[in-house]
Amino acid sequence: MRKITLACAATLFCVLVALGGCSTHSQEPNNEPEEQQASSQQPVDVRAAALKGPTAMGLVKFMDEAEAGTVSDNDYSFQIAASPDELTPQIAQGSLDIACIPANLASVLYNNTDGAVRVLAVNTLGVLYICDSNGSIQSVVDLAGKTIYASGKGSTPEYALNYILEGNGLTPGRDVTIEWKSEHAECVAAMTKDSQAIALLPQPFVTTAQMKDDSIRTALDLTEEWNALQNDADASSLITGVVVARADFVDEHPEAVEAFMKHYRESVAFVNEDIEAAAEPIDTYDIVPAAVAQKPFPRATSSAWKVTK
């Protein structure tokens, strides 16, 4: 298994290994018929959240089914947030049960809550890009003396960008100025207003920017730049997002957690396999417009929305 060595994610790796997903205790065999066991279980309120982008896209079929009542094993409610800052206090305070969040934020929450948060799955790999409009950025060193618009301070985008800059001999804040915005949409707006602007964007926001200004291009793929800094085949992989749950919730409702992950996997498979059908609910939930949602899928599918237990 490849190691996860994202800055501040050594702890995350320990969480993944030590906690092993959502399994918590061995149980005595139950010889009741499966239907009888299912009918005897009371529905559980499961409060879930995700960020606008690939992780929220992967949930749309699940959300649709929960809203329509076709998924009825538990009572699921969903929240889509624009920024990790909206979800962090809710997870820490117990008003959310399961959330799709940046990988390093999971590590921070694990430490800040003394292990009260568990990682269930890795759901998003590398979907981050440096974009420009004038072709001036051909390599990481070309960022020297430049200003980069970015969102996600204190989470994966910041740590990944800093790692890549430092690996190429550039010091963030000294050699490269990073102007942090509260949302990726603000970075897109900055690029469309200034032809000299450079931005760090994930998909599908890259496509959103390109649909507004066709001169915007992906100058650098941060996954490729990350891999270029690794020295051996067993080196780290750039992990962007994970699924986490409150430890108390996992212990109290293991069947509900298993059911959630099953529905999530099925939803992810639907999004990957039927782009056109997935685009409509993605638009409906105001994640991104349908026209935008369809375009990044071919590039993002290989790395995003792959849910593993």
Show which residues each predicted segment covers.
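Short, low-complexity disordered leader/linker segments with a strong preference
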Residues: 1-45
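Surface-exposed acidic, glycine-flexible loop patches that form ligand/cofactor-binding
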Residues: 8, 140-141, 251-252
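Short, glycine-/small- and polar/acidic-enriched structural segments
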Residues: 28-181, 195-203, 215, 219-222
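Flexible glycine/proline-enriched surface loops and loop-helix/loop-strand junctions
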Residues: 144-146, 242, 301-303
